[in-house]
């Protein structure tokens, strides 16, 4: 998951940084740090990245990692 994917995923489901932090059980500064990295969400542990990803995927976000990494909503 890239920082851009994380920002886009949040925007796609209209989730604030504070709400994502709360649901993932991490601090708001942690979410901000993840989203500010230019390439990858490498500023935090793999465990923290997984917590965030689980929340986003539970809301229907699907991460795409082809030639152009992105996000989309899963079809119901």
Regions found by a protein language model. Give the residues of each.
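Residues in the helix-turn-helix
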Residues: 19, 30, 48
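Recognition helix of helix-turn-helix/homeodomain-like DNA-binding domains
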Residues: 26-44
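DNA major-groove recognition helix of helix-turn-helix/homeodomain DNA-binding modules
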Residues: 46-64
């Amino acid at each position: 998951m890239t920082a851009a994917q994380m920002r886009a995923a949040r925007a796609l489901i209209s989730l604030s940084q504070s709400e994502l932090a709360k649901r993932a059980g991490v601090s708001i500064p942690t979410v901000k740090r993840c989203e500010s990295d230019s390439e990858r969400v490498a500023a935090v542990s793999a465990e923290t990245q997984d917590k965030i990803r689980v929340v986003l995927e539970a809301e229907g976000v699907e991460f795409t990692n082809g030639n152009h990494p992105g996000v989309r909503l899963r079809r119901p």
